[in-house]
Amino acid sequence: MKKRIFLLALSFELIIIIATSVLNAKSMPEIPDIISKNKINYKTALKLHNDGKYLDAYNQFTNIINGNDEALIRDYVIYYGAKSAFYCEMFKEAIDLYSLLMKEHPRSYLYPYAEQYKALAEFYRDDYPVSNFFNGKAQKWIKEFVGLKALQKTNNKNKEIALELINRFYTKDAIIYFNNNFQKEALNLPNNIKYKMATELYEAGFRNSSLNYFNSLIKQNYNKANCLYYTARINQQENKREEAAKLFDIYLANTNNKSYRRLGLYYSADNYYKLKNTKKSISLYQTFLKEYPKDDYVPRIYNIFLNESLNANNLISAKRYLTNSLKKFPNNRWTETSLKSYLRKSLRLKNKTETYYGLKILEERHSKLRNDFILSWNIWIANEFKDFNKRDEYVLETLLTSKNPYYIKGALTLANKDMLQNVYSNNAYNMEEAKKFFADSNYSKTLEFLNKIQFIDYIATKREDKLVKEARDIAKKIFMQNKFVKDFYSKKTENEIFNELSLQTRKESNKSILLYYYGDNQNAYNEFDKIYSKTQTTYPLFYYAQKIFLNSANTKRFMQICNNIGKYFGYPYSQNVDLLPEEFRKYIYPRYFDDLVVPEAKYYKIEPEFIYSIMREESLFDSKALSWAGARGLMQLMPATARAENKKTRYKFNPLNLYDSKQNIYLGISHLSWLFQSENASNYIIFIDIEETEYYVEKVMKSYEYYSRYY
């Protein structure tokens, strides 16, 4: 049996809270409402502010301040009153309010922001020479903030401000601004400033702009060696490999060029490798190994050498590189990649000795985790060598022990009647033992035996049978002994939940909840997350976490909480998600963005469950996710892929914004459809940022199996 990864294309608002200090367990107050009924309150003033009606907002905020209302969130009232005044260019009033906030609330989350904007308001009010401000006593971060903000507002001082930021701090955003608006003047700056601008522009992704500065510096013979390195890299990244090769050669020819020699050797070797000049590439890689034997790039190079040897069916040479990598860099991911490559090639060549050599190492590396992953390799290898008895042992072990439906489904394709009967008998025994311990109120032992039950028919048919229902019913009765679960199902009113939380956290949570009910979701999140991180987790805390985190679009943070939901009632759910109550299972595997996913998936004839699986594993449903490789948004689309999809007549989003949930989902589903329809499903990984394809696919397909059963 060849090992295949099947990606299923078609199957995928508080009255003012002033009495919280007297809350105690013996006397719980009733709070019938939890927002102010005053016609003018924080909510109405904030809406005016957010709608751009700053003068009206300022007047409302100052009325609240002078009336001593909203005491619990007074720092926020003052802050947005100051900000409204600032936007009206009432700088004196803004400064007075920012000063008031800093005086009254030195520990407020808003203090540093007030400090920044107060300095900015003073800058605009005083209108003194730019150099006076930058020569002042303000801290660097204040000067940078004021400078960058002033660049967006001033017209007669922007060049001077940008130069101050560049000369003093090499501020990246100021460099980009100056380059975009005063490029001719930039080319005439002192060479040391020009070089720093070039490197900052390069790191920020403005490669062509940086190239102009590097070329200018080379002509003036300033820091020529380093400039040569950067120009070589830019040409390489722009796929101008022949020109890059020449420039790398010039740079490396002078052994005194030390600053970027390490990177120069590596990238030059990589460049020649892409040019199919293997001899030159290998020579450069060998020089790198000699000069930098402990560098993190070494296992990458070993992997290249190993694959060259494997392509030539030279297991002896490949094994030497693998051994070096295992010995010197045992925990490096490239070592793992090399091991798997060696193992696959040995198996393909039917070399039993080397196959089992590689398998033994793989087993040692994963002896404590991912046992079913190792079992899958054993099944595959035993099958390839026609050792069917051993294969069947591993199949049965998978069916009896694995909690990953992805691997169980694979094992079921090879299972015979005797194996299935073995599982059924084992399930019957475990159920009887679980019932005995449950009758004795020994709940830990009950769960122990329930966890041993393998729901293979549920996995195969996606329908709960008698066994599953009975096991889940017993588990829920055990979970209901816990206060968290009991409170979850108690159907308490929101006032009751709020009062309980006030007892647990005193004043800490009330501010965030008040902000939430007034619609200030992001600030509610900022305040509440601090509490959640340090307070014992209870149901009222979880209740408001769900409301606040989701309404502030911090879905990823809530997913991180839900992924550990079992710890709130003492059950390591990862052992068996199926035993959890339905509501808890759907917290772990939620269907967010249903209104976007379902119709689009239906249009392209792709199962929505597959889309949710990708979003869950790629971004934890975080629409602002950004990977180290540049993949963006919910489905982690690469910009080039998204631009190509956006040319289709069905879309043409303008402007294209991959952090927009709708755009990301629509373009992602469209691209998946193309991959499947063009029979490129095996290349599906190309459009996603992944380091370990095999493990990634395992996670996505595991999620798919749960989604397809829970909805």
Regions found by a protein language model. Give the residues of each.
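N-terminal leader/linker segments that initiate helical-solenoid repeat arrays
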Residues: L23-T62, A71-Y76, F145, N156, ...
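Short solvent-exposed coil/turn linkers within tandem alpha-helical repeat scaffolds
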Residues: P32-I35, I64-R74, L101-Y113, F133-V146, ...
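Alpha-helical segment of the N-proximal tetratricopeptide repeat
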Residues: K39-N63, I161-E164, R168-F169, K196-F206, ...
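Residue at a conserved register position within TPR or TPR-like alpha-solenoid repeats
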Residues: L48, A85, E122, L165, ...
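Single-residue signature of alpha-solenoid repeat helices
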Residues: A57, A94, V130-S131, A174, ...
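Catalytic glycan-binding domains that act on GlcNAc-containing polysaccharides
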Residues: R300, A312-L315, T337, L349-K352, ...
